[in-house]
A protein has these predicted regions:
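Glycine-rich NAD(P) Rossmann-fold beta1-alpha1 loop
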Residues: 161-168
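Conserved small/polar residues in nucleotide/adenosyl-binding loops
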Residues: 290-297
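Glycine-rich beta-strand-centered segment in the early N-terminal region that forms part
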Residues: 27-42, 54-94
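Rossmann-fold NAD(P)-binding glycine/threonine-rich loop
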Residues: 253-265
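NAD(P)H dinucleotide-binding glycine-rich loop of Rossmann-like/cofactor-binding domains
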Residues: 90-157
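Adenosine-nucleotide cofactor-binding segment
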Residues: 175-231
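Glycine-centered, small-residue-biased loops immediately flanking beta-strands
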Residues: 243
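Helix-to-beta-strand junctions that scaffold the AdoMet/dcAdoMet cofactor pocket
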Residues: 239-240
Length: 300
């Protein structure tokens, strides 16, 4: 195989930020013990920030972005993998601190890789990507509420930022688990799309993007929040007793103005979802959970 490959390369000199496709030599790849022929990658919110100006996430240049990829191992210095193994990578700060997947060839730590299940194609793995992993972890967190409460049924689940990657896959997964999903979105033109994913109801974002009450009428057994800010604060105020909230995004704001009443009077639980650094065992479990996969319902 040729030692030459192409990649998107970011550079910054002073105030000048640039991005271009370059031909590189494999010696350019600095880190890792497994070399992968990249077949697919995807585009996440974080990728967009990095491609725009580094997003304050990239510390060293030149840099190859792309936080996710799937492909085949072509060379391994680690006994965990051999040539020909099909693998998936999401997170672990690849594409930020380490060179990423917007490249024909990637070289990464073996501990960052998951073997691709046989019944999931390389393309389907990137249809899911980080967004899919995060949303499935969120769905499992809400499902776990039933186990924690000895079978107390989850019925009504709210998904914010519903037209985004995490929100869209969360709707599919939660619907397949049998929950009644309500989607929050500011995009009225996407109502048919959200219903096609399984959302039973759609609420305009403006209903949530306002100052919250300390505690409100309990409406939701579970919440998947991808946006933060006032929208999350209102969702917390509206969560039913013993409800669980998966916090997995900050598209609206990093801020959260809430109070103790929903926690003390209703016993609600907030579960932060860090899919970027979760264990390999947890990743392997999630990608093997075939009946919740997005591509079975929605392949766009």
């Amino acid at each position: 195989m040729s030692d030459q490959f192409k990649a998107i390369v970011l550079n910054q000199e002073g105030d000048n930020f640039s991005r271009e496709v370059k031909s590189l030599d494999r010696s350019f790849l600095k880190h890792g013990d497994v070399t992968v022929q990249v077949e697919y990658s995807d585009l996440n919110f974080k990728d967009g920030m990095i491609l725009k100006n580094g997003g304050r996430l990239v510390k060293e240049y030149p840099h190859i972005p792309g936080i996710d990829f799937s492909g085949k191992v072509i060379e391994s210095e680690n006994s965990k993998f051999k040539s020909g193994d099909e693998v998936i990578l999401t997170g672990f700060r690849v594409g930020e601190v380490f060179f990423g997947g917007y490249s024909q060839i990637a070289k990464v730590n073996a501990d960052f890789l998951v073997k691709k299940p046989d019944n999931l194609s390389s393309k389907q793995a990137m249809i899911l990507g980080t967004a899919g992993l995060t949303s499935l972890m969120s769905a499992f967190a809400i499902q776990a509420r039933e186990s924690i409460l000895l079978g107390e049924k989850v019925n009504d689940v709210l998904v914010t930022g519903a037209t985004g990657g995490v929100g869209s896959v969360a709707i599919i997964a939660l619907t397949k688990l049998g929950y009644n999903v309500t989607a929050v979105s500011g995009k009225e033109s996407k109502s048919d799309y959200l219903k096609s994913l399984g959302a039973k109801n759609i609420i305009n974002r403006a209903e949530f993007d306002k100052d919250p009450r300390p505690i409100d009428k309990g409406l939701w057994d579970g919440v998947v929040d991808t946006v933060g800010g006032k929208i999350l604060a209102n969702a917390i105020a509206q969560t039913k007793p013993n409800g669980i909230i998966s916090v997995c995004g900050n598209a609206n704001s990093n801020e959260l103005n809430t109070n103790l009443l929903p926690f003390m009077l209703r016993g609600i639980k907030v579960w932060g979802m860090d899919s970027a650094n979760c264990s390999i065992k947890r990743r392997e479990f999630t990608v093997s959970y075939t009946h919740l996969r997005a591509h079975e319902t929605h392949n766009d």
